[in-house]
Design a protein with these regions (language model features):
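Short functional hotspots at interaction and active-site rims
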Residues: 1-253
Length: 253
């Protein structure tokens, strides 16, 4: 029995320590977020999602599992008022060099300064796995889709934090066990379901003598999908996030 009970006890102790540490991390995150908000910082959520070719075409290929197969990455940000007035970035993931990633983040910071003044930019660490649910409960989603790739696309949270502060902003990372405090997953779900349901309407077919071609208006498809996440929908989603924030501030304090 000794060899069986010891691993079990060890698992319970480790899990308990992890949960306690996770709760402290969440409370610290929420207190810092509230402090910045009370100091006049506007909250902006920054995220990214990968869009595989099969999602666009509706045709799955064996080559898509290869790391060399091209995957598009969409980067955007939003506030309680809706998508921020900044042109989203749609790039091939292989083209996202460190220099380009930093340039994108710098451009966003400058745009936020012009539109909102000082902001607290909330994102997920690129090393964090994305969990749709959480231990205490699950947020309803718009549908079941493959998990989003971790954000942020920027090479280093620390370098982005320095860039944010240089522009008068602050950067916060949502604790990994509380990703439903991060509303971008709902927006990406909305976008991808729009792509699935409407991709045929954005495809043109040309038939020649010996072959046929299909042209997909990819950029237009993405823009229309983004527009489906309206300011009113953003308001509902972020109000839900605020309720969770208030709940954990009360229960974890």
């Amino acid at each position: 029995m000794q060899r069986f009970t010891s691993p079990l006890l060890c698992h319970i102790i480790r899990r308990g320590c992890f949960d306690a540490a996770s709760k402290r991390q969440c409370l610290h995150y929420l207190k810092v977020l509230r402090s910045l908000q009370h100091s006049g910082f506007n909250t902006v959520f920054l995220g990214e999602t990968d869009i595989p070719e099969s999602l666009i075409t509706g045709e799955k290929t064996a080559e898509e599992t290869s790391l060399r197969w091209p995957v598009w990455t969409l980067v955007h940000a939003a506030s309680h008022q809706g998508w921020v007035p900044w042109r989203h970035k749609l790039l091939l993931r292989v083209d996202l060099s460190t220099h380009l990633q930093n340039a994108i983040f710098q451009e966003l910071c400058e745009s936020l300064t012009m539109s909102y003044g000082k902001c607290v930019i909330v994102t997920r660490d690129k090393m964090q796995p994305m969990h749709v649910g959480a231990e205490e409960g699950k947020e309803p989603q718009l549908g079941t889709l493959p998990p989003a790739t971790p954000a942020i696309c920027m090479s280093s949270v620390e370098s982005c934090r320095e860039a944010a502060r240089a522009n008068g902003h602050e950067l916060l990372v949502v604790p990994s066990s509380y990703n439903y405090l991060y509303p971008m997953a709902v927006a990406w779900s909305s976008l991808k379901w729009f792509i699935i349901n409407n991709r045929k309407d954005f495809a043109l077919r040309s038939i020649g003598n010996n072959s046929s071609y299909r042209c997909i208006l990819f950029g237009d498809l993405i823009v229309k999908g983004i527009e489906k996440m309206t300011p009113n929908k953003w308001k509902v989603v972020i109000n839900r996030v605020k309720k969770w924030e208030n709940y954990y501030l009360d229960t974890l304090s």
